[in-house]
Amino acid sequence: MNANQAAESNLLASNQQKELEDLPKDYPLSTSEDEGDKDEERKHQKLLESISSLNGKDRQKLADRSEASLKVSEFSVSSEGSGEKLVLSDLLEPVKTSSSLAAVKKQLNRVKSKKTVELPLHREEIERIHREVAFNKSSQILSKWDPVVLKNRQAEQLVFPLSKPQSAFAPIEHVVNGWKAGTPLEQEIFNLLHKNKQPVTDPLLTPVEKASLKAMSLEEVKMRRAELQRARALQSYYEARARREKRIKSKKYHRILKKGKAKQALKDFEKLQKVNPAAALEELEKLDKARMMERMSLKHQNSGKWAKSKAIMAKYDLEARQAMQEQLARNKELTQKVRAASESEEEGEGQEEEEEPLVPDLVNEVQIKANGLNPWMFRNHFIDAKEAEVQKDLEDPAEPEAQETSESEEEKAVVEEETLLKEFEERRSLRQKSELNHMAEPVHRRVTKDPSSQEVLSDLRALCQKLRTENHQSGKQELSSARTAQREEPAREEEEPMLLQRPERARTLDELEELGREGCVENEELPRTAVEGLQLEKNLSNHIGAPKEKKRKEQMIDLQNLLTTKSPSVKSLAVPTTVQELEDEEERDQRQIIKEAFAGDDVIRDFLKEKREAVEASKPKDLDLTLPGWGEWGGIGLKPSAKKRRRFLIKAPEGPPRKDKNLPNVIINEKRNTHAAAHQVQVLPHPFTHHQQFERTIQTPVGSTWNTQRAFQKLTMPKVVTKPGHIIKPIKAEDVGYRSSSRSDLSVVQRNPKRLSIRHKKHLENNCVD
């Protein structure tokens, strides 16, 4: 309709235009007519505008006229008035009744049942579907390995290859069944074993025992089983007891156990000696021979390959350390001299082990000389060797001196002297053991050689005897006799070295008080003779005026005073003081030792110089803009004037105060180290949840200096360990308990990826959604 209206309007406009063009040709125009023409044009223009503004709906509809015709065309069919479309079934209505068109009907029904074929998907869409399906399927397959990957990531250490081949051990019966005797000796042994029915393996019961059990009655079998159970229980009890005893680390327990075993062996030997003297003599010869062989073989001297290897591993292995300790104990046992110990000595040793000292060991230490030599530069092993020689000499049995007279008093004095000497030797050995742990010893102590120590001991006994005989005389006579006895030996004392002077160990509070009363410190500035005379007078006056409370203690004090030979370089015994004074003295000695050790190093001056340089380097520098030759002469040897320098000098502002400004003993470097920035952590690492955890881990020391060997190995063990020569294969599904499927949903895509039907696409999409 709109098209018809537009055509009509165009036709009308063209007709009017033609009429206007033809007007001037028919009629000539005048001036008045020109004015009229203008008015007409104006009116015509308005007419055109009004025509163009008209709506097509308001126009009248032209009527169509149809005429009958003899020739009917297919285009003349009109469906006007019906309101329905023409359907193929309407045309086939008259055909339904005819039976000749049955085949056409079937074909028509088949065509009706078929649906329209969808267009094939585009290549990009097919590839996108392939990618989505492959991603979903591969992520589903890989998600099965998440627990395995997480376990490997959380493991402290991974040792590759992960699958360790299990070594197959063939049973002994399989080995024996295929074995044949090759030599006559093997054949003879094999025949004996099979003849007596001895088990080749290690069964619970032998064939003989099985046969005997079959022959037993029920009661005998029960009794036999009860005996076996009791034997097993006893065996397990003794094994547990042996394990408990082996874990005991008490030295006192092992010492008592060792003494008990030695006493039991001695009792068994005495019993054997009474029953069978010949066997006892043979046993004694065996022991002596074994001791001689041990001493000759030197296997106990820590010089063999085994000892050296154990010494290296003793730091890490407890068993190696125990083996080294046993060897050292064996060495000490073999190298010491054989001396029969009396019962009284054994009882005394037992009492000394059981008793605990009431006075601490710090009270008995001798104060070290403040201005002495540096003990770090002194060789202690030389002194230890000399002390060992003196100890061996002192352990030799003393010669009896009581044979000269037959009086009872002299015999008692000799017995007391012998007991005092033995006690002195025992205390001396104890002091030597305790002083092995000291870091330094005074340099001015020296040890006598063998002949000199014997002579001093003989002089000691003579002087003790003189003192006992002259106790009833007057003090003046005792003083004169002691002075004469002292003057007789000056040359010998100057030529020979002195005995090692050691303080007496006070074990009770009474002994501590007595030592406090009797001990005194000698003035070193006095001459030798004056000091000796004063000391002798004081000792003799103490002996005369002191009450006789305990004779044994008095004799021991006399022995100690007489044994102490004075010299300007040797200090006397120090009076026991409190623990605080000893600590102060140790601090002073330590300061003196450090001062002597670092005598050539002026550490404080170097430190102050280094700090001064660091402070100067950290200060902001002034900017000098002076240029030579500007405003004045310049050249070699000419410097800018001070006025010009002050004019062009830009002073730098003062920087912030240093952190170590009020810390004289510290240098704090405030510069940013660019090399350290690469090792700084910007983000918190994965396993940690808080920065304090990470800082605590970083601050924990890792080195072997601050940790035990086991902890150091655990902290520094590598994350991954690979064995050389082994092939590392990838993990298989069978290794972790999964079954590998031979067919998957991706098989269709992998087989023909470019031909993906709609059915397969829907199936794959449903699987992806699931």
UniProtKB/Swiss-Prot annotation:
Residue ranges, compositional bias (Basic and acidic residues): 56-65, 411-444
Residue stretches of biased makeup (Polar residues): 1-17
Location of region: Disordered: 1-65, 334-361, 392-455, 467-505
Cystine residue pairs: none
Keywords attached to this entry: Citrullination, Coiled coil, Isopeptide bond, Nucleus, Phosphoprotein, Ribosome biogenesis, Ubl conjugation
Cleavable signal peptide: none
Role this protein plays: May be required for ribosome biogenesis.
Subunit structure: Interacts with DHX37.
Protein name: U3 small nucleolar RNA-associated protein 14 homolog A
